[in-house]
């Protein structure tokens, strides 16, 4: 979903709620909170905690360090 130069495919999708939502770009994601269609992630880190769902990518195989590194990367976009 988050591909290309702005890290979005600009597609409207159903994230399991029955509603349609535009895939937002990841560029600037560190400055746009809360995150997700329902605002469940107050921070990027929350995406990997209480808001983690398979509909937003599988993170089960990521280590704690992988997640920390990914959060640091996302904050640079």
Where are the predicted features?
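Periplasmic c-type cytochrome electron-transfer domains
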Residues: 1-77
